[in-house]
Design a protein with these regions (language model features):
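Short, well-ordered beta-strand elements within core beta-sheets of diverse protein domains
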Residues: 9-12, 60-67, 122-127
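Catalytic core of tubulin tyrosine ligase-like
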Residues: 18
Length: 153
């Protein structure tokens, strides 16, 4: 039998997904290109208390809003080297998507905004790669987006 997306060993991997994701959320929170970070490990998250009870080891899902809107988000995503663009999240590798041009492409803009999918919104499924490698990739992508924004002014 084949196991879809490595479900047979997910219990071994989940702590790495969660710790990587929490560390990246923390670092993103202080990055100049980030408007908002959405991750249940952050006390500012509206569901922080519930998340601590329901999933105390955390989650590998991470979302954030990049300053500069959708163009900056796309530049960020296209500039990544080890994190791959995908619309199906949740494997061993780190994946990224900009919902406005993938999963929510055909959802009316007003409805997207009501759901929190605002300009610059990025969603990631953090994998089990080395967290320092992931951060270097993310920081480099954010710097590429910043450079693009400066060049546009």
């Amino acid at each position: 039998k084949s196991r879809s997306r490595g479900l047979g060993d997910v219990y071994k991997r989940q702590p790495v997904h969660a710790s990587n994701s929490a560390e990246l959320a923390k670092r993103l929170s202080s990055h100049e290109m980030i408007e908002k970070v959405i991750h249940t490990s952050l006390e500012a998250h509206p569901d922080y208390d519930i998340a601590q009870k329901v999933m105390p080891k955390g989650s590998g899902m991470l979302a954030f809003i990049i300053k500069g809107g959708d163009q900056a988000a796309l530049k960020f995503m296209k500039s990544l080297d080890i994190i791959f663009e995908a619309t199906s999240l949740g494997g061993v590798e780190s994946l990224v998507e900009c919902p406005f041009n993938s999963s929510h492409m055909f959802v009316p803009e007003e409805v997207r905004h009501e759901a929190g999918v605002v300009p610059g919104f990025v969603r990631m499924s953090i994998g089990i790669e080395d967290v320092e490698d992931l951060w270097k990739d993310i920081d480099s992508g954010l710097n590429s987006a910043k450079k693009m924004m400066i060049e546009m002014t």
